[in-house]
């Protein structure tokens, strides 16, 4: 098979960017409902056409690569659907309303953003999962922030920054384990070495969030009172429902599978719906049914579809609205289409051609790290999956780092700096799509405020430029 040139390989990426630009410009937030997916499929068709007509790639090879890509994210799709049900159950079961009710009274608005980042960081370190952190405590923090008058971009940015700090440094994180294993670096050696770039990034982020918090004009206490009163009117606020996040935390600490943990958490929240919020379920069920049938129908509708309960204020009505598993379907569809594109580019040799282009710029330390960062970012854009990007980046540069005498921990750190934390900043990446869907905040809205994620690759390059704590394992040949 002939290998396409980097210029030809970049053509589908350029076409995708142009198509997405006009699609988002025309459809806005509705682009996720089908427009973006069509853009990805059209670009996939372009890749396949180029590969089959000019480079001798068979459709069977392309199809096989696409199937492998989709198989690789199958567990993520299941998690997404469960998260949709969990988010609805936590809201309508009174878990999130109770957390918000007490949270707005405990967390001072001046310290909210920095507290938001720190809380998510701690939870994510303990759980090893940014997705679980954002889908649980992140949703509650969004509600608290809105009640205190913060813009949703700032709130989501603080949540994303904290959650991905924890995801990056936690020994329980799958990306942390993957980056260390792919580069043959001991896990805790990898984690310790990441601190030289991770700590400056998170400290700068916390300073920015602190300044932003003190610059924020807090909502009138009467507005917060209206908010909390509205929650108390709609839901039965009780400490008993907080057993759900407590049990969830215990399961996570015991390293129970993410799918099992989320499923049990959802089931417990459903019990809370039945015990503490039966009136809410009857309202969701609507007229025509009563008794146990109404409760059963309410649970089914809540977990599977959208609900919109009327509250005392429009803001509160919007906050307590849920989308269930059905609300995740656009994201699932988008991920499937993104995997099609990644598979087609892989089968046609385009990803390999582009990544080899980055390898040419690896003559000195700074350029080697910069090329690794650029390659990781590109793969995140092209494959739409952080796991694939970590594997490809690590395998591609492993020999180069060894040849130049750089320690494997430098490659593992740079890979995480470039891939793990930037994945939620890309609208069509699995992480970007998921977090935007869970928080109900478009990726491009929270992107400017996700300071930790933006700073990490820049700090990584800067540290390489000054040569801080970078040694060669052997002399260069």
Name these PLM-found stretches.
Residues 159, 164-172, 198-219, 463, ...:
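Transmembrane-helix bundle segments that line or gate the permeation/cavity pathway
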Residues 1-79, 196-206, 213-337, 477:
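Hydrophobic transmembrane alpha-helices of multi-pass small-molecule transporters
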Residues 142-154, 440-444:
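Helix-coil boundary and interhelical linker segments in multi-pass alpha-helical membrane proteins
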Residues 55-146, 305-398:
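Membrane-embedded alpha-helical segments and adjacent helix-loop junctions characteristic
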Residues 10, 182-198, 202, 343, ...:
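C-terminal transmembrane helix pair
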Residues 135-141, 159, 261-269:
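Central hydrophobic cores of alpha-helical transmembrane segments
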Residues 131, 163-178, 391-400:
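Short helical (or helix-break) motifs at transmembrane helix termini and adjacent helical loops
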Residues 17-21, 48-49, 118-122, 143-144, ...:
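Alpha-helical transmembrane segments of multipass membrane proteins
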């Amino acid at each position: 098979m002939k290998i396409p040139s980097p210029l030809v390989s970049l053509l589908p990426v350029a076409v995708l960017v142009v198509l997405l630009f006009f699609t988002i410009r025309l459809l806005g937030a509705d682009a996720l409902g089908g427009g973006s997916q069509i853009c990805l499929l059209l670009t996939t068709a372009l890749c396949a056409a180029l590969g089959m007509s000019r480079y001798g790639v068979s459709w069977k090879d392309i199809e096989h690569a696409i199937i492998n890509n989709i198989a690789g994210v199958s567990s993520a799709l299941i998690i997404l659907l469960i998260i949709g049900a969990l988010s609805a159950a936590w809201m309508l079961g009174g878990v999130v309303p109770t957390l918000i009710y007490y949270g707005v009274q405990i967390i001072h608005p001046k310290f909210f953003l920095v507290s938001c980042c720190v809380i998510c960081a701690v939870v994510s370190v303990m759980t090893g999962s940014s997705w679980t952190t954002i889908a649980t405590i992140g949703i509650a923090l969004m509600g608290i922030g809105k009640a205190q008058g913060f813009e949703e971009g700032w709130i989501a940015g603080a949540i994303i920054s904290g959650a991905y700090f924890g995801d990056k440094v936690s020994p329980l994180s799958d990306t942390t384990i993957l980056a260390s294993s792919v580069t043959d670096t001991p896990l805790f050696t990898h984690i310790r070495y990441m601190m030289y770039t991770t700590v400056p990034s998170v400290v700068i982020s916390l300073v920015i969030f602190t300044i932003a918090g003190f610059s924020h004009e807090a909502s009138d206490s009467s507005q917060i009172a209206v908010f909390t009163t509205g929650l108390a009117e709609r839901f039965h606020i009780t400490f008993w429902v907080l057993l759900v996040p407590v049990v969830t935390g215990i399961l996570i600490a015991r390293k129970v599978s993410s799918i099992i943990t989320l499923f049990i958490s959802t089931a417990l929240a459903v019990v809370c719906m039945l015990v503490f919020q039966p009136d809410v379920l009857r309202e969701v069920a609507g007229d025509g049914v009563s008794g146990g049938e109404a409760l059963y129908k309410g649970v089914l509708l809540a977990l599977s579809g959208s609900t919109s309960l009327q509250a005392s204020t429009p803001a509160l009505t919007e906050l307590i609205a849920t989308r269930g598993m059905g609300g995740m379907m656009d994201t699932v569809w988008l991920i499937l289409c993104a995997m099609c594109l990644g598979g087609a580019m892989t089968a046609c040799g385009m990803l390999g051609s582009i990544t080899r282009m980055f390898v040419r710029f690896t003559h000195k330390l700074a350029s080697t790290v910069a090329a690794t960062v650029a390659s990781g970012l590109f793969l995140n854009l092209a494959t739409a999956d952080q796991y694939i990007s970590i594997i490809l980046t690590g395998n591609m540069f492993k020999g180069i780092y060894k040849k130049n005498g750089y320690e494997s921990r430098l490659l593992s750190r740079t890979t995480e700096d470039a891939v793990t934390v930037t994945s939620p900043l890309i609208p069509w990446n699995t992480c970007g799509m998921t977090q935007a869907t869970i928080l109900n905040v478009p990726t491009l809205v929270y992107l400017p405020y996700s300071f930790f994620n933006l700073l990490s690759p820049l700090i990584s390059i800067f540290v390489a430029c000054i040569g801080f704590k970078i040694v060669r394992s052997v002399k260069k040949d």
